[in-house]
């Protein structure tokens, strides 16, 4: 499975390092490209934009600062949703309000892609060791979960699933 990560802060970088360590093919992007250099040295490919990242992988993990960052990274002119993303899976791990996830899910689904929320419990150390606790939506996100987390629960419907038909 080809995985991409957008957002290489402390948690994103730790998750990316773990995925590389266990053998996943990884492409990464960050607003500050220098944060990606250690991951490139470790074997990750670098994307020049979120849109390029989404074009190269099957699954995109996002772990971003806030709702404004989510909007910029997903919806900007070269954002994750700027190209053809039909059939791709987005795993959203940012700590944001439920309405942000609901709105994002609508935009992602309108492009023919899937989105699952996956809030995590833990810090950088457990992330680096693959010992985060991940709570995710549908089981479709489970194939890459063991690399990130020691405890994974498919929680059934997510906030964005339950609200997909809301006005």
What are these regions (language model features)?
Residues 31-32, 66, 139:
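Residues in the short beta-alpha loop(s) of Rossmann-like NAD(P)-binding domains
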């Amino acid at each position: 499975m080809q995985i991409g990560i957008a957002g290489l802060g402390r948690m994103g970088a730790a998750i990316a390092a773990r995925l590389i360590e266990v053998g996943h093919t990884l492409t990464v992007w960050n607003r500050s490209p220098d944060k990606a250099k250690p991951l490139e040295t470790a074997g990750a490919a670098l994307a020049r934009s979120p849109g390029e990242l989404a074009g190269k992988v099957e699954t995109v993990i996002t772990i971003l600062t806030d709702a404004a960052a989510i909007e910029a990274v997903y919806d900007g002119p070269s954002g994750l949703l700027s190209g053809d993303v039909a059939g791709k899976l987005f795993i959203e791990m940012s700590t944001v309000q439920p309405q942000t996830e609901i709105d994002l899910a609508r935009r992602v689904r309108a492009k023919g892609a899937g989105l699952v929320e996956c809030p995590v419990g833990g810090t950088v150390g457990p992330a680096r060791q693959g010992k985060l606790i991940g709570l995710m939506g549908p089981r479709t996100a489970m194939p890459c979960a063991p690399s990130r987390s020691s405890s994974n629960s498919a929680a059934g419907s997510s906030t964005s699933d339950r609200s997909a038909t809301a006005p």
